[in-house]
Structure formats: C-alpha cells, structure tokens
Swiss-Prot record:
PANTHER family: DNA ENDONUCLEASE SMRA-RELATED (PTHR35562), UPF0115 PROTEIN YFCN (PTHR35562:SF1). SMART domains: SMR. NCBIfam families: PRK04946.1. It is an enzyme of class 3 (hydrolase). One of its GO terms (biological process) is rescue of stalled ribosome. Pfam families: Smr. Associates with collided ribosomes, but not with correctly translating polysomes. This is Ribosome rescue factor SmrB. It comes from Buchnera aphidicola subsp. Acyrthosiphon pisum (strain APS). Keywords: Endonuclease, Hydrolase, Nuclease, RNA-binding, rRNA-binding. The gene is smrB.
Length: 186
C-alpha cells in the first residue's frame, strides 16, 4: 500500500463517519398561492397596469403542440424579416434587458412578459433576454407559443450558450418608433 492509496482510504473513512448521521433531502414541488389584488386607485399605476395587462392579453392558454417542436426554437413574424432572424441566430444582437421566469406560474409569467414588452417599448429597447428554465417544461413550451401570438414580437430564437442555451430565448421587439422604419435591422 503506497502513501496515496492510504491517504484516500483514510479520507474516505473520515468522510463516511462525518456523514453518518445525515439523511437524504426530499425534493417537493412548490405550490404557489394566489396573489391578492390590491385596490389601487392611483391613475398612473392604473395606466401602467392596463398597459402591461394589454400586452399580456395577446397570450392565450390554448396550446398548439406542433408549433414549436423543432430544436432550436425560432420564429419570425413575416418572411421579409428573415435577415433579423439570421442576425439573431448569429448572435449579432446583444440583449439590453433580461427577465427570469423561474418559479412563476403561467399567469405570473404572462404578466411578466407583458411588463417586459411595455418596458422595452417605453425605454426603446429592441432586444430582450427571457430565461424560462427547464423545470417541468411548462414555461419552456408555453413561452415561445405566447411570444408568437404577440403582434409586437418581430423574431425570437433560442439563446446562445452564454445566455442560457435552450433554457432561454432572445427576442426582438418592435418599438413604436420603429414601426414606421423597419429597415433599421438590415
């Protein structure tokens, strides 16, 4: 028995003794409770709420299972905007804003996406990063479907490895001032 094997045997025994009284953790599913709505009559907050709600109105719950089966997930609103998708796939657009949907319910995720689109249009940000994660694949399957229904989404594609790979999406959002001049992306 050489020095190295003796050292590993001793450290292995010590490690087992140290973990002797531990028990295995049980991973449970977390159930979220409904959030109680506040009665807020402030006109500015109501306006912001209605804008965000208007954007989340486009997201329906119907599920078309055949729509986004290809991997990686990608979408363009119109074939004339194919150059935008091509540049997005090549990684030429860097997102200026990011949102993480981990741990949210479907309704909360829709509200968060509506808030993201509202913020992007107000701040004139055209590229966003949406992190939906893996989990039980509910948000992973629904997020591309919801985004494809929104009229202000120009294109989206699975994020590069640096931004989360298949657990995230990079989105190009149409800004109101860009509706007149869409050639900014060429």
């Amino acid at each position: 028995m050489d020095k190295n094997s003796r050292y590993t045997v001793d450290s292995s025994i010590l490690f087992r003794q140290w973990l002797n009284d531990t028990r295995e953790m049980v991973q449970d599913t977390i159930f979220h409770s409904r959030i109680q709505k506040k009665n807020n009559n402030h006109p500015v907050s109501q306006r912001v709420f209605f804008e965000q709600n208007a954007h989340s109105h486009y997201f329906s719950y119907r599920n078309n299972k055949n729509l986004f089966k290809e991997n990686p997930v990608s979408y363009i609103r119109h074939q004339s905007l194919y150059n935008v998708l091509k540049n997005l796939k090549k990684g030429r657009y860097n997102p200026d804003i990011s949102i993480d949907l981990h741990g949210l319910t479907q309704h909360q995720a829709q509200q968060a996406l509506g808030e993201l689109i509202t913020t992007c249009q107000k701040e004139k940000i055209f590229c966003a990063h949406i992190m939906h994660g893996h989990g039980k694949h509910i948000l992973k399957k629904q997020t591309p479907f919801w985004l494809s229904q929104h009229p202000d989404i120009i294109a989206f594609h699975e994020a590069p490895k640096f931004f989360g790979s298949d657990a995230a999406i990079i989105v190009i959002i149409e800004i109101n001032s860009l509706k007149k001049n869409i050639n900014i992306f060429n």
